[in-house]
């Protein structure tokens, strides 16, 4: 909804900035990201509704704070850039509205974005938009990403700092801990990290292009993140990353490009044992929620297979169960690093193979694995219901 206020045809509608509404989410994201790409509005909710809302907020409107009944008549948004780089920003005169979101939101914005200035060239801008999309995905999935609500990470002692619930920390906030972090993350593609009970994921966003990895830079970033996880979350090692992309076409392109790289240390599966590809759509939002359930891997395998057929990581290849002589592999988690190992074993070994997947993963898997593999689709809603998502 554009507003929680009553709407009478022919009359101007006042927009109420109510928690949970599209306008509240949009203001929250801009307060964290500075700008947001128009092409990715669908990540934040109904794309058609949000486009109409952005158009409306790009003209002078009256907005209302439901908690205090304070009113503000202002042009909230402006557009910048063209094509894929077209983005939404606040108008400077509207910045006080951040106080409606949280008392610390305005101060965070002004410190993070140089008092509402956006220096830098196209590469800097592209990184900003990657970060913005990533924030939008986490916020929509219910993963806390509001930096002003998260306890600050530190490197002085081994403490339990991170929240019990899943939380996303931006890479730019890693750099505030010590100046040395600046050099470790400056030239890598990492945009942040999710801390959840029992683990941590490095998070990347490749948007609509094949992921290109800075091999040694990513190793250094991983080492730095592992130290932060050890000092703040009780996590001793990190072997997993989440890779966001526009669609499964992006995942396929990334895998095919990776096949051309012969030096393992420059391939993403040489850096992280597990890479979970998450498309930036409603299916990806569901996948985010799955990946942050405590002990989700075991719960998922228990749901899919009886104990007597499971592999329990035994055997000559990556598979999850053996049923009637067929090796069954689950790709419900979107782990493309594990998928590479499965395909390599499948191509060099004889036997019957079956892959479990969600409906939206099937075309990508058919293209990557070839026509002779059996694909069995699983209803996403059923999995969510069984896991309590």
Where are these regions (language model features)?
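Mid-protein regulatory/catalytic core that forms ligand/cofactor-binding pockets
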Residues: 123-255
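Nuclease-adjacent, charged terminal/linker segments that flank catalytic cores
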Residues: 1-128, 151
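General detector of folded, globular domains
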Residues: 87-110, 122-140, 191-193, 327-331, ...
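Hydrophobic, Leu/Ile/Phe/Ala-enriched alpha-helical segments that form helix-helix packing faces
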Residues: 45, 53-61, 134-145, 224-233, ...
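Short boundary motifs at domain starts and secondary-structure transition points
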Residues: 15-16, 192-195, 316-321
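Generic detector of well-ordered alpha-helical segments enriched in charged/polar residues
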Residues: 27, 51-54, 135, 253, ...
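Short secondary-structure junctions
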Residues: 60-65, 144-148, 299-309
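Long, compositionally biased intrinsically disordered regions
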Residues: 203-210, 231-234, 238-389
